Amino acid sequence: MIKVTIFLLLSIFSFNLYGLELNEKVSIKYGAEQGVGSADSNTKLCSDILKYLYMDEYLSEGDKATFEKKCHNVIGNIRNTFSNKNTIKEGNEFLMSILHMKSLYGNNNNNNAGSESDVTLKSLYLSLKGSQNTEGESEVPSDDEINKTIMNFVKFNKYLLDNSNDIKKVHDFLVLTSQSNENLLPNKEKLFEQIVDQIKYFDEYFFASGGKIKVKKGYLKYNFLDIYKQPVCSAYLHLCSRYYESVSIYIRLKKVFNGIPAFLDKNCRKVKGEEFKKLMDMELKHNHIVERFDKYIISDDLYYVNMKVFDLKNVDKIQVSKIDDINNLNIYEHKETMHLSAKNLSRYIDIKKELNDEKAYKQLMSAIRKYVTTLTKADSDITYFVKQLDDEEIERFLIDLNFFLYNGFLRITEDKHLINADDVSPSYINLYRSNNIVALYILKTQYEENKLSEYRAHKFYRRKRVSNITNDMIKKDFTQTNALTNLPNLDNKKTTEYYLKEYENFVENFQPDLHDIMKLQLFFTMAFKDCNVNQNFTETSKKLWFDLLYAYDKFGWFYIHPNEVINSINKTDFVRHVLVSRNFLLKNNDQLTFLETQVAKIVEIINLSLEVDKSPDSLDFSIPMNFFNHKNGYHVMNDDKLKLLTSYEYIDSIANNYFFLSEYKNDVFRTGNNFKLYFNLPNIYSLAYQLFNELAININVITNVPLKKYLKYNASYAYFTLMNMIGKNHDIYSKGSRFVYASYILGLVFFIESHIDIARLKPKDFFFMKQSLPIIDHVYHKDLKTLKKNCTLLTDFMKINKNSQNYSLTHTEEMIKILGLLTVTLWAKEGKKSVYYDDDVSLYRKLMVSCVFNGGETIQEKLANNIEKSCDISQYGIKSKNLKDMIDINLSIHKWNPAEIEKLAYSFVLSCKMQKLMYKPMNVEKLPLEDYYKLSLAPDMVKTYHCYKLGKQAAELLESIILKKKFVRFRVTDAIDVYDFFYIKKVLSSRIKKEYNEFLQDKRAFEKKELETILNNSPFSEEQTMKLINSYECHWFTSYENFRILWMHASSNLGTGTYLKNFFSELWQNIRFLFKSKLKIRDMEYFSGDISQMNLLDYYSPMVHSESHCQEKMQVLFITLRDSKEENRSEIAQKVKSAYYQCKLDYYKNHHSDFIHRIHPNDFLNNKVYVLKQPYYLMSNVPLNNPKKVSRLFVTEGTLEYLLLDKINIPECFGPCTKLHFNKVVIKESKQRIYDMTINNALVPEIQPYNRRKYMTIYINEAYIKNIVSDALTSEEIKRHDIQKGNIKICMGKSTYLTEPILTEEHFNLTHKPVYDFSSVKHNLKVFHMKNEHLVSEDPNDDCFINYPLATINLDISDPYKEISEDLIKNLYILKSS
């Protein structure tokens, strides 16, 4: 798994870019000489813009004249509106378009530094802004303010141009893995300290002894009734709730039991109150029968009490004798005695035997039954059930109630071997599970709001509605402002008091005696015995929890309003809804508690990310623009700042749910009293999904319908259950803690899985692009409409306050929105990669995530609106109806990555603004060959759109030829002809068949005619035009895979079948011939001439040759084993696999430095040597005594072909290799190729135009940064911070060229230990401050003569020499045939 840290991003935004120095003096007086409305100043400014761009190669004289003419009017309009707050965006975007155009096409080194006549971005900004000032701006901005504004332009432009996202996976959470960031460390450490620190509340009351948790001596007389006022209760909300549930049950049932004697005095002649008290007395006395319990499990054995004794430790002991048969009890029979602890014994009462009077027994039971009915008379159904109870059931009620009040835990005699302490602690759920139904009847009718049975509960719920709340009423509660989001917040004091009020009601007017205090301490201990540091609520998560509970009870805020839930349930279905809810809560109480506590941790991380948003590492857009307007991101991002990571990337990083990089999963629930803080969290979506399955199965059982098909039509069952989880559960049989966080997560997961995740119904839906990117035909419009519909459903559902009146967002809603976005992202994720960059994520999920983050607007809609707002698309002949098609096509080219297409779209807008002023319009829909030069200058989105149309026409031509030749006469040469025709034609043909036949008659003449047409109609010189032609290639004709997709599309249109499949399979295997001659690395890097004599290693050659070598040996081995009568056929595969690994190891060991793996002088002479841009990445593989820690890796053309054809992960490519990861090696003394893109270094000849130069950054793993301590030129100290800011360069001279193998004997016998610290030995990892670059030696042999900017990265990619690539093995056969 690849983990890219923030350091990569920091390097992206280094400020020393494109020669745009920001330290020049402000030589122009602010507003002087540039009077607004002055025609001369407008003309001068337009002229200055041309000087600044220096685009001579891309602008003809006519284009320059056109620009100056159009520019004059545009400048006048912008100057007049630059002071208007509503129209200032136009001016800013115009400046951005100038900078962006210069970056793409201009010469960035044309100015003489220090000249007073220099035209800089700053001078253009000052001139354009003129003497007008925006509202609230000082008369003359300071130099620092101006520089800051220009810097923001530069940073944003670099962000748009950055292509490092090609290797991007998801960033580990920005704060929690940025251990070296001085600004973020305090916040991160504070969070951990808060979490760990709260265990002190537990330590204040408890201590561990003999594996048991006990109350400290200082609290032995404390009754714990008002513990809700203490921090321990708010730090562990769910545990405190469990405690007070036990307390309330105890107090209420004790009151019920204490009322029995007085009732008997009036209603029972044979057994009066005092006799009843003696009968039920639990004090152990001589002749009493007792039962024994151990860890709350009651033994089947009974004992007879002989006497009380005291041991030396003053511990109560009871001398007892075991009873063999309770029905034949003889107290005078001599039995063997034993001494048992009084704490583990309880009196066994058989009321019938104790009374020894049948009439008295029946009269007593009748009186108790009558007493219970007086308590349950509020509901006739319950009263009727009580009257039907027989005497034995009434007796059991009395016995169990008496046992509980005396011992403090429930008496369970069935399935005893399955119970534990959590099962016997007093709770409503445990009373129900232990069949204490009569006690629940009494508690329900005496103390609950809903006193009716489930058969009549609908009457209660119909009456129990949330009052209609207006926004004005809500504002009265939101009287505070959150410091992080600046949004209205609920009064913390009010929400806390509201929550604690319920606890106060439990304990008011109760005066506990010493016996009660012991029980209260037991309840407190039982509730907190499993307390651990991973389950607490810090101040932030507790505050939001209180807010959500208050908002639900007072306003009905939830995904589904409680009134709507009740209205959706028919009277006849109400009992079934109650039963579904009850069954789910009874079964999943623990799992819900677990989910609750883990979401609380996620809330902390979200809050921490909001704090990070205040960090200095941001793109400041207090400068108004239309870019990156996320409608559903963090609220703070919608004001004036955009982070280096967008709001999506923040949440995507949080969605990984890991504090640190530990992959080990720790059980943090019911693990006993554990003080260890685990640095990873479970995936809350997975936890909620397991609960969703339980809920869905519950619904299915009750409704008896196919689960997956009709789940959403029975959603009322789920919402009613959720209502009982977050609200006050009025079903006493499943009553328990309120699961606020769990309700929100489970509610959203249920909606996603039942309404949004269409894969549940049609697994293949919206996976249509998985194997066939990019799109060729638009057959998906209907599906995309479904996506839009579902996205709207989801975004509407996620709003917890659905009041349609004008209303400002609150902090509570913001936090739930973020939690909802996190949940949606987790739904889409297939691993720890970013959703947008993960090929395993379906198109549907990628686009759904993007749509939700944009507030229900699809990425296509958003970009189309933004483009039309800022760009006149008619410049390229594009109409509004085709704009979304163009966006879809570009999306498909970029693997449907919304982040990439957004950057591409804004690059398009900026280019469009300038090109509108520079060039004549073109019509990309019907582009004639005469205008082809315009396509080369067009934005990438326009080129891709044209390429799509060209590919579609190529596929249609191919289909027609195949059909015409009836398959059997179609040859590979026909495919080659189609390819060559479009490669030469370059534009759409209106007479495709006629021109194709003309091409077949004389290919050279056709190519010459097409080329001459382009050259003759271009306003540029022949040399410039050829450069334009060569600078752009259509996607379909650049790689084997791309061209193959075109044929895949053709085959799918022609039908299916074995013959057709085989036909195209053979075609694809041979199609590679087309590309061997087309392979071209665009970037070239200059090296000194003596490199050809250095006997360099062809680094990845052994890997390639070992595959071929071992495959041949394995074929022989397989045949031998297959034909051997002694071999077990089931073991052949494993034997071949083991032999394959051994063969590879032997080859590396014996042949990795063979002559065939060296680069020869002829390879350089024939221009067939390439170098990976990045040096050897796995530096820890290099032995400590080897000084070559930094090594440039060179490969020959043959090795390069294999690496590009295979999808194996190469560390130096940060994944699978593409042409962008290599440079072509060019000897300085060879013939100059001045129009190729050149990597800028000290060997580049002066003749090379600066605008054709490319800047290259060297990345090394951050694990090796500790070895960089000083400047190689001045010996001054170098800090990690200097590298993060992009102020360091790395020396990449001849000492880095790899001439000897890195692998040693230790690598082969697996005894090599990775080397991360080599600071104590001599090594070639040399760096220096950019400010000291003038001190670099002019000797080409000096290590630092060649140098590049340095940045850090953190990628975990294993050494490809340790892996077998199936794709490579298959491709070897294809290439071998050539």
UniProtKB/Swiss-Prot annotation:
Keyword Transmembrane helix set for record: yes
Position of the signal peptide: 1-19
Disulfide bridges in this chain: C46-C71, C233-C240, C791-C851, C871-C912, C947-C1034
Primary location group: host cell
Chain ranges passing through the membrane: 739-759
Entry keywords, A to Z: Cytoplasm, Cytoplasmic vesicle, Disulfide bond, Host cell membrane, Host cytoplasm, Host membrane, Membrane, Signal, Transmembrane, Transmembrane helix, Transport
Coiled coil: none
GO cellular component entries: cytoplasmic vesicle; host cell plasma membrane; membrane; rhoptry; symbiont-containing vacuole membrane
Domain of life: Eukaryota
Cellular localisation: Host cell membrane; Parasitophorous vacuole membrane; Host cytoplasm; Cytoplasm
Membrane-topology descriptor: Single-pass membrane protein; Peripheral membrane protein
Mutant phenotype after disruption: Conditional knockdown reduces parasite growth and proliferation. Late-ring stage parasites have irregular shape and trophozoites exhibit an abnormal stunted phenotype rather than progressing to mature trophozoites. Parasites that transition to schizonts harbor significantly lower numbers of merozoites per schizont. Delayed parasite maturation. No obvious differences in general schizont morphology or in the ability of the erythrocyte to burst. Merozoite clumping after egress. Reduced capacity of merozoites to invade an erythrocyte.
Subunit structure: Component of the RhopH complex. RhopH complex is composed of CLAG3.1/CLAG3.2, RhopH2 and RhopH3 with a 1:1:1 subunit stoichiometry. Interacts with CLAG3.1/CLAG3.2.
Role played: Participates in the formation of new permeability pathways in Plasmodium-infected erythrocytes enabling the uptake of nutrients from the blood plasma. Required for maintaining invasion capacity of merozoites. Required for parasite growth and proliferation.
Name of this protein: High molecular weight rhoptry protein 2
Species the sequence originates in: Plasmodium falciparum (isolate 3D7)
